[in-house]
Amino acid sequence: MLDILLFSLYFFFEPVLFFFFMVVFGFVALNNYSWLGCFYFFDSFSFILLIVMSLFILGVVLLSESNFMLLLLSEVLVVVCVFFFVPSNVILMYMYFELSMFPILVMILGYGSQIEKINSSYYLIFYAALCSFPFLFVYFKSFFFISLVYFDFNLSWEMVFVLSLSFMMKFPVYFLHLWLPKAHVEAPTTASMLLAGLLLKLGTAGFLRILGCLSFVHNNVWIVLAFLGMILASFCCMFQSDAKALAAYSSITHMSFVLMALVFIIMSGKTGGVILMLAHGYTSTLMFYLVGEFYHVSGSRMVYYMSSFFGSGMIMALLFAVVFLSNMGTPPSLSFLSEFIVISSSLNMMKFSFWVLFVYFFSAFYYSIYLLTSSVMGKGYVNFSIWNVGFSVPLVFMMYNIFWMSVFF
């Protein structure tokens, strides 16, 4: 496997060839997932689906980005993320987990448009360092170095908390989330698409690996954090005037929902959580892409100015409507199916969650419909050409593709 990947470096400076090579690599992974190497192996279909999603996002980035250096950084990030999904031991997983921060950091510092990008980079580094070093401490104090990447040791509650902390920063859960809106607002559109679509999935994928530890301890603290994150972040969405910040807080609500699905340690919750991760990856990538396109054409990200899409470009308007309807979880989108599974499993485990979910969906519908109506009605500020978004249509099909369900059931 390693020699194949070294061969891929030959294509590295030709982004389109590299994309096709990675697609072929993905097909090999799908057909050969029992293929054990020394350091990497494909252990689960959910991780293969995440690899497919990362390649899909790379394809959209290739089509939408013209800056060669940003394309190279995107390729580096996708390779690191693919390696993160298939390691055989914990230290490799940790290494790629931390390595994934650097391409995003270079994108923000090198290609962000405002001076606040320095502040947001400080936030990113500080949160990453503070939450990740405890993971190394637990790693050296326990027997992880002789274990495979799935581990279910009987650890104390404090150790499990410290272990989860680094993944919680990448979810991100509410209270560890401050770096995300700042990074999104300062990052170029490509970095935002990769950050929302790929980087947040590393936290959930890592947390999936350590779910075995949680079966020995009380995980009430994560349930409370997930409930708080769902409600507080969706309230934050209501008060945002910047469309990119709104999309960032919307990511936090969805990832809190995924956390709630995973910490009720039951199979249906885990399945719903993984499908929700995939749905969120496709939806949020497109959300940031559309907001970025609007910003490039109009020079503003204000929700107030995002009016009259339907008057200026019909395809743009329809795509915008489909993406935000999918973000709300309307059927037959992948979001709706996964949310339905998660709701049914969480109500089985905890009856109280009905009230939290009620408030969450009420507020989530509100901010999505508010953005949708404010963009549909009103006086037109911007004229969109029809070609700006022609290549995003496949992503919408992927988002609404119920076929993914057959992999799980």
From Swiss-Prot:
The lineage of its organism: Eukaryota, Metazoa, Ecdysozoa, Nematoda, Chromadorea. Core subunit of the mitochondrial membrane respiratory chain NADH dehydrogenase (Complex I) that is believed to belong to the minimal assembly required for catalysis. Complex I functions in the transfer of electrons from NADH to the respiratory chain. The immediate electron acceptor for the enzyme is believed to be ubiquinone. InterPro entries: NADH_UbQ_OxRdtase, ND/Mrp_TM. One of its GO terms (molecular function) is ubiquinone binding. It is an enzyme of class 7 (translocase). One of its GO terms (biological process) is ATP synthesis coupled electron transport. The chain crosses the membrane at residues 9-29, 44-64, 68-88, 90-110, 125-145, 160-180, 194-214, 221-241, 246-268, 273-295, 305-325, 352-372, 389-409. It holds the Pfam family Proton_antipo_M. This is NADH-ubiquinone oxidoreductase chain 4. Its main location: mitochondrion. It comes from the Eukaryota. It catalyses: a ubiquinone + NADH + 5 H(+)(in) = a ubiquinol + NAD(+) + 4 H(+)(out). Belongs to the complex I subunit 4 family. Its EC number is 7.1.1.2. PANTHER family: NADH-UBIQUINONE OXIDOREDUCTASE CHAIN 4. Keywords: Electron transport, Membrane, Mitochondrion, NAD, Respiratory chain, Translocase, Transmembrane, Transmembrane helix, Transport, Ubiquinone. It is found in: Mitochondrion membrane.
